[in-house]
C-alpha cells in the first residue's frame, strides 16, 4: 500500500527505530523547555539577578553550536544508537546537576555541556531518521519534530507540578532526568541504521536521485558545499525568527500595553501550541506536497501573520491571530528543509551538523539584536526585525530553488 509515493509496508519494518527517535525528541523537548520556567528558581539558588542568569541561554546556545559540529562527525564514524543513548545519559546527568549548582559560573558550565548534549541528540535524530526512511522521510521528519513539540509542551507542566508538590525546582529537574532513562533503554536494544555517506553513487543502471543544476559545471563537491551553505544560512534565518518571536512576544505585548502578564504568558503558550499543532498537521501534508511547495506556503504564512500584527499593532485580537498564524506557519519549516536537502544531496552526520551550526547561530544572534534595539527604538522593532529576517529568508529560498531544481519523484 502507498500514499502518494509513501510505501507504508516498507516503512512498517522501520517503526521501532522511528519510535526510538520520537522518544529521544520528547526527551529533547523536555530538556530544551526547562530553562525558561525555572529561571527565577535558578536565580534564587545562585543568589543572582535575572539579568545575570539570562546568560544561561547564551551558554546553552554556545554548547549547541559546539555539539552540532562535533556530533555530526561522530554519527558518521560510530554507530548512531549508542551515541544517541550516551548523549541522553549525559543530558540526564546535567539536568540532575543543574539545581545543585550554588554558583553562576558552575551553572553556566553545566548549561554549556547540556547544550552540547541536546545538539548531539538533535543532529542524531534528524540524521538517523533520514538514513532509515531515505527518500520517503518527509512525514516521518515532521513527526519527529512534532514529538519535540510534545516534550516542550509537557516540560513546563511537569515542572509546575513538581514545584507545587515539593516547593522547589530541584525535583522538577530530577523528574525530567529520570524520564530519559526508558528512552535510552529503547534505543540500545535496536540496531543502528546504515549511513547515507556511501549513497553518492547510484547503482549501475539507476538514474541519479540528485538533480543536475546550473552549478553542475563547477563540480558536484563545490555544488554540495554551496547548497549546504545556503541551507545552513536559511536555517539561521528561520531559527532566528522562531526563537525571537517565541522569546519576545511576551515582552512585546506587555511593553505595548496590550495585555497583562497572564494574557502575555498565554500568548507565548499559544505560539508554541500552534507550532506543535502545525507539526502534527504537517505529517499528512508532507505525503501530498513536495518540500518546496510546503516551504513556500510556510514563508507566505509567516509574512502574512507578521503583517497582521504590524498593521493592527494596537489590537490584541490581531496579535492573537498573528501569533497563532506564526506558530502554524513556522512549524514545518525545519523538518521540511531537511527533507528538501535530502532530495538534493546525500545527508551525512557532518552535513546535518553544519545545518545545526547555522540554526544555533540564528538562535543566538537575532534575539540578541532585538534585545539591543528594544528599549532604544521601541517594542515594534521586534516584529520589524523578524519581518526583515524572513524577507531575507525568502531570497535565500529563491536562490536554493534557482541553483538546485526539484528532482523527479522517486
Predicted regions and their residues:
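Helix-loop-helix hairpin linking two adjacent transmembrane segments in secondary transporters
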Residues: 135, 143-195
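Cytoplasmic helix-loop-helix junction between adjacent transmembrane helices
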Residues: 110-148
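C-terminal transmembrane helical hairpin of 12-TM major facilitator-type secondary transporters
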Residues: 289-337
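Conserved MFS/SLC helix-loop-helix module at the cytosolic interface between two early adjacent transmembrane helices
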Residues: 66-105
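Intracellular juxtamembrane helix-capping segments at the cytosolic ends
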Residues: 120-133, 331-345
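Helix-breaking motifs and short loop linkers at transmembrane-helix boundaries and internal kinks
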Residues: 47, 79, 100-105, 134, ...
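Helix-to-loop junctions at the C-terminal end of transmembrane segments
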Residues: 67-79, 278-291, 374-375
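Extracytoplasmic gate region of multi-pass secondary transporters
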Residues: 35-36, 224-269, 273-277
Amino acid at each position: 500500500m502507498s500514499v502518494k509515493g509513501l510505501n507504508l509496508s516498507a516503512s512498517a519494518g522501520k517503526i521501532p527505530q522511528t519510535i526510538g527517535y520520537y522518544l529521544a525528541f520528547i526527551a529533547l523537548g523536555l530538556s530544551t523547555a526547562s530553562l525558561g520556567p525555572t529561571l527565577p528558581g535558578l536565580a534564587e539558588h545562585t543568589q543572582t539577578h535575572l539579568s545575570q542568569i539570562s546568560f544561561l541561554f547564551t551558554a546553552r546556545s554556545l554548547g549547541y553550536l559546539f555539539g552540532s559540529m562535533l556530533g555530526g562527525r561522530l554519527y558518521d564514524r560510530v554507530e548512531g544508537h549508542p551515541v544517541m543513548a550516551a548523549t541522553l545519559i549525559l543530558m540526564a546527568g546535567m539536568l540532575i546537576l543543574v539545581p545543585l549548582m550554588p554558583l553562576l559560573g558552575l551553572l553556566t558550565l553545566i548549561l554549556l555541556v547540556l547544550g552540547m548534549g541536546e545538539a548531539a541528540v538533535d543532529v542524531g535524530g534528524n540524521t538517523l531518521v533520514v538514513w532509515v526512511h531515505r527518500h520517503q522521510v518527509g512525514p516521518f521528519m515532521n513527526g519527529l519534530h512534532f514529538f519535540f513539540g510534545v516534550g516542550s509542551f509537557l516540560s513546563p507542566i511537569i515542572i509546575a507540578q513538581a514545584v507545587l508538590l515539593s516547593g522547589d525546582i530541584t525535583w522538577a529537574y530530577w523528574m525530567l532526568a529520570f524520564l530519559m532513562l526508558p528512552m535510552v533503554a529503547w534505543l540500545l536494544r535496536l540496531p543502528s541504521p546504515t549511513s547515507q555517506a556511501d549513497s553518492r553513487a547510484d547503482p549501475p543502471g539507476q538514474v541519479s536521485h540528485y538533480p543536475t543544476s546550473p552549478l553542475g559545471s563547477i563540480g558536484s563537491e563545490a555544488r554540495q558545499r554551496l547548497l549546504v551553505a545556503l541551507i545552513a544560512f536559511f536555517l539561521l534565518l528561520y531559527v532566528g525568527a522562531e526563537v525571537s518571536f517565541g522569546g519576545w512576544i511576551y515582552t512585546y505585548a506587555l511593553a505595548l500595553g496590550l495585555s497583562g502578564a497572564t494574557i502575555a504568558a498565554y500568548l507565548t503558550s499559544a505560539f508554541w501550541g500552534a507550532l506543535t499543532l502545525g507539526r502534527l498537521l504537517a505529517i499528512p501534508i508532507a505525503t501530498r506536497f513536495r518540500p518546496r511547495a510546503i516551504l513556500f506556503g510556510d514563508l507566505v504564512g509567516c509574512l502574512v501573520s507578521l503583517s497582521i500584527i504590524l498593521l493592527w499593532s494596537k489590537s490584541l485580537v490581531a496579535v492573537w491571530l498573528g501569533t497563532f498564524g506564526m506558530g502554524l506557519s513556522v512549524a514545518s519549516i525545519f523538518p521540511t528543509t531537511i527533507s528538501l536537502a535530502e532530495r538534493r544531496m546525500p545527508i551525512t552526520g557532518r552535513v546535518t551538523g553544519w545545518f545545526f551550526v547555522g540554526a544555533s547561530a540564528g538562535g543566538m544572534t537575532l534575539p540578541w539584536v532585538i534585545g539591543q534595539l528594544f528599549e532604544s527604538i521601541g517594542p515594534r522593532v521586534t516584529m520589524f526585525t523578524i519581518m526583515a529576517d524572513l524577507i531575507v529568508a525568502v531570497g535565500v529560498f529563491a536562490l536554493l530553488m534557482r541553483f538546485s531544481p526539484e528532482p523527479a519523484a522517486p
